[in-house]
Each structure stands twice: as C-alpha cells, then as structure tokens.
Amino acid sequence: MLTGCSTAKYYSHAVVGHLQLTTGQTPIQKVIDNERTEKELKHQLELVIELREFAETKLNLDVGKAYSKYKHLDRPAAVWVVYAAPAFSTELQSWKYPIVGEYQSKGFFKESMAKDYSAKLKGEGFDVYLGEATAYSTLGWFSDPLLSTFLDDSDEELAEVLFHELTHRTYYLKGDTMFNESFATAFAQKGVQLWLKEKGELKRLKKYQDTLRRRDEFRGVLQEAKTQLGLIYKNTSNDPVDTLQKRKQEFFQSFKRTCLNLRKKWNSKDALEGWIDEEVNNAKLAASSIYLLKVPYFTELWGQADGDPKTYLELVKKL
C-alpha cells in the first residue's frame, strides 16, 4: 500500500518525466529537411508522416497533432513498466490513477525508480516483471511526441506501434486494462494489413501475416498456461508453501519447454527468447495476457464490421 508521501513523490516524478518527454521537440519535417539527419532516420520519419495520414484518412483514428514532432532520448525506453502478481496467483495487482482509473501496471520515467519499486514489491512477496515501453501516450490529453525509442524496429512494427497508440487516443475504456490493450493490439494489426495491402506490398503482407499466425499460436499456448496455472493454485491453495513453490517451479520449467518446441517448429533461433532465456513468473505471464488473450474477440468483431474501420470503432464503443 502506498503512503501519501510516496504517492506525492510518484506523481511529482510523473509530472517531471512527462515534461522531459514533451518539451524540446522538433517538427518531423524540420528534422527531415536537416541535411545532417541520417538517411535511416529520414526514412523512418517520412514513414511516420505516411502512417499518420493513413491512420486519419483510412482507419478513422483521432490523430490530431500526435506524433508530429520528434524527440531524441538517450535511453532505451520511454517508460519502465512494473507488473506484479501474488506469489501463487495469475491475477495482476492494480493501481488507481486520476485519469485512466485502475490500471494493472505502474510506469516510471526513471529505470532506477522502477527497479527500486520492483525490489520493494518482491520484498513483499510479489512476483514482479519489469518491462520497457518504447512508446508514450497521454490518451489524447496532449499531442504525444514521436520518440527515438519508437524507431528501432521494422517498418511494419513501427506502423503497428503507431496505430496501437493512436487507437488508445481514439477510444479508451476507463479501468479495463485487458479490453484496451487487446482492442488496440487487434486494431493495429488490422491497420497494418490494410496499409500494406493498399501499398501493393503483397510479399511484405504475407510475411507480416505469417508473424501474426505465430503470435496467435503463442497466444493459445499462453492462454492454456494461464488457465492451467490458475487451476493449480486454486486446487492446492491449502498445501504447504514449499509444495506450492515446487509445483510452480515445475510448471514454469514445462512452459519453457513448450516455448522451446515452438521455436523449433518455427525454425527461428531467436523466437520467444524472452520466454526461454529469461525468468518467467506469474507477473510476466499475466502481463502478456493483457495484450493477447482478448485479441481473437476483437478480431472476430472486425468481421462483423465487414472490415470497415469506422464501423468497427462504432461497434467497439457500444460494447
């Protein structure tokens, strides 16, 4: 439980962090026109201009002035995000915020603060997962900056992240993390496919769709794992802690083997490395579920809208 003093400190840090991200921005076109700007950065910024226009005119998203100005960051992430779950539960801890309501993560603009808070939660017995967010969204309250951390991935990944964040800006259901993230994930994926199709990039479209099929296969594995682990905790809740801990450890070892088998099936040496080579716990399992588990539902809704973005958004807002 946060004390009043620590809450004030957190919000003070949040205000300062927000100002650091939103001041000192440069219009994208000005960066492009600068002869000192590297070729790759110019390409990415020109792509963002194209994607913003597509998002507004074809996807019916609220673009406004979001991501129209560039900000370079000398760090790998915009925000460090802490997720926590009890030692024997797959349900994430929630925190309350003034604008978005309850949210199942806590973000920090300083990595050191995120690590300190993670250590505090671990000391209280929680499983903790510390992730990095490369994008930043104020849900339409401000004109969000295009951060350099945005631009490390492929064109398709950049498009997906941009469409995801603009989806949040367009519609956000207060207090329902899984709804918002799964909806934004599903809509962004459909948006990328429409964009590639309009450009006539059929080979890239097929490659992207192959990636989505792999993600969907992993989503099924993740959903099954979360369900099974939840049942283990429920059915053994009265067992000694040592017994619970052993079963938990055995479960995650088995889960890693399943991920390794998927990697072999896909013939991709780097696939799922965050699940195979790094620690996996309740918090990481549950955090990933937020973004994936309801995606099939929102994908099905896309079919009900006959693939029309405007109709789709109207259907989502009625849910």
Descriptions of predicted regions:
Residues 10-15, 210-217, 279-286:
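A ubiquitous short alpha-helical element
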Residues 33-37, 50-60, 167-171, 188-200, ...:
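Sec-exported extracytoplasmic/periplasmic mature domains
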Residues 18-55:
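Amphipathic alpha-helical packing elements
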Residues 41-42, 51, 62-81, 93, ...:
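A well-structured
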Residues 220-319:
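Pan-zinc metallopeptidase signature
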Residues 4-26:
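Bacterial Sec signal peptide processing site at the extreme N-terminus
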Residues 42-45, 49, 114-118, 159-164, ...:
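Extracytoplasmic/secreted envelope proteins and their assembly/folding machinery
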Residues 50-215:
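Acidic/His-rich structured neighborhood in mature extracellular/periplasmic domains
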